[in-house]
């Protein structure tokens, strides 16, 4: 949850990294070099205030809802994993992963093709491809097909999981008949 482009960096004085981006600080604009004190030494340019505020809201929401949210994610993700195991030609790559991320492929079909079908014919959004991890895909043997990645959130329902599984079952069946 939150806007892309924002995160946190936690460290202690012994592991304090050296700044790698330099530029105006906004707090000490008269200096030609980055300030030496934290956090200013790590804050080059204009801060992404909307993303920072959104991240703060996401953290607050998670602190209030995290336990129930995690239980819902686990329930829906496990339903998806167990359902995918029953569909011929579906290869799941995240069986032992306890998160809400489920990655799979269908036979030797392109993950992009599967993603497009899910989007265009079923209105289901997933990610496809190599997910910025080409070496992982080489290790897994999926560098040619990529993987379909489902990201389950606490707002997803079992009904949505079954709709998704029904769509994958139809797609896999159609791909087998080609």
Show which residues each predicted segment covers.
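Pyridoxal 5′-phosphate
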Residues: 1-178
């Amino acid at each position: 949850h939150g806007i892309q482009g924002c995160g946190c960096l936690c460290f202690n004085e012994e592991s304090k990294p050296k700044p790698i981006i330099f530029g105006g600080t906004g707090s000490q604009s008269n200096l030609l070099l980055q300030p030496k004190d934290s956090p200013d030494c790590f804050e080059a340019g204009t801060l992404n205030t909307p993303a920072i505020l959104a991240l703060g809201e996401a953290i607050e929401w998670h602190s209030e809802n995290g336990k129930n949210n995690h239980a819902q994610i686990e329930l829906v993700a496990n339903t998806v994993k167990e359902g995918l195991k029953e569909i011929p030609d579906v290869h799941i790559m995240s069986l032992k992963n306890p998160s809400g991320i489920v990655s799979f492929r269908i036979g030797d079909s392109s993950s992009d093709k599967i993603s497009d079908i899910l989007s265009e014919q079923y209105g289901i959004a997933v990610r496809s491809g190599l997910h910025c991890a080409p070496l992982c895909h080489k290790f897994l043997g999926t560098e040619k097909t990529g993987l379909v990645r489902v990201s389950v959130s606490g707002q997803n329902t079992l009904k949505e999981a079954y709709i998704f599984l029904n769509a994958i079952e139809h797609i896999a069946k159609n791909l087998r008949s080609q």
